[in-house]
């Protein structure tokens, strides 16, 4: 077993028999020799210049002749396994299992069926069924109806609104007792009351609102006459007609007017 010193780098034996005096290692620098050409050790073996091998012209000619004979022999056999013509179908067989063509064009099969005669000569399509057989199979299939919509679309909602509006027109509107002796009583409340807007040409349903208008929104509203029965004068104010889309007309507002 040897122990190496860090200073002298000389081996020191642990046995007394192999002991030697420690000596330092002296390295002598030598100049490299001046060579005219030095081999490049970084060049891979594949990029080195290949040596010209001796080629026998007679053996090369013999190999060419055998290859030509083999190619001619394989081409002469009709059912050779290496030729794709073995798997081609005759015109009679193609007519038996022809897929559905588009506009009677044989080269449009790629548009209607997954198997194409243009790319694949041996299609695996089954003969087409008759029209009656196909209709019977379609009639026997269970049809899945879409779930019924809970919310009505725009057309159904308009039909329902028009029907309820026509029913409310036929019925007499309940009148509310006049407030403070006013001449024009307030219109009654109906659950489904609508009106026609002349500016938009549509029906508007006032479902869920407190008051339902019975007049056209574009008619001029006049102030009601002052009440003479009570000391406080009541003036009925209504919102003026708007030129924009008439979606909602606010009901009449009665404000007490006190004289100073």
UniProtKB/Swiss-Prot annotation:
Induction notes from the record: Up-regulated during cilia assembly in IMCD3 cells.
Please give a single GO biological process term from the UniProt record: flagellated sperm motility
List localization entries: Cytoplasm, Cytoskeleton; Nucleus; Cytoplasm; Mitochondrion
One Pfam family of this chain: SMRP1
Keyword vocabulary terms for this entry: Cell projection, Cilium, Cytoplasm, Cytoskeleton, Differentiation, Flagellum, Mitochondrion, Nucleus, Spermatogenesis
Please tell me whether the keyword Ribosomal protein is annotated for this protein.
no
Q: An example Gene Ontology cellular component term from the record?
A: mitochondrion
Give the phenotype of cells or organisms lacking this gene.
Deficient mice are viable and have normal fertility.
An example molecular function term from Gene Ontology annotations: alpha-tubulin binding
Q: Does the keyword Cytoplasm apply?
A: yes
Q: Please state the protein's primary subcellular location.
A: cytoplasm
Q: What function is annotated for this protein?
A: May participate in intramanchette transport and midpiece formation of the sperm tail. May play a potential role in somatic cell proliferation.
The record's PANTHER family line, in alphabetical order, gives: SPERMATID-SPECIFIC MANCHETTE-RELATED PROTEIN 1
What family, per the record? Answer: Belongs to the SPMIP6 family.
Q: How does it assemble?
A: Microtubule inner protein component of sperm flagellar doublet microtubules. Interacts with alpha-tubulin.
Q: What is this protein called?
A: Sperm microtubule inner protein 6
Q: Which organism is it from?
A: Mus musculus
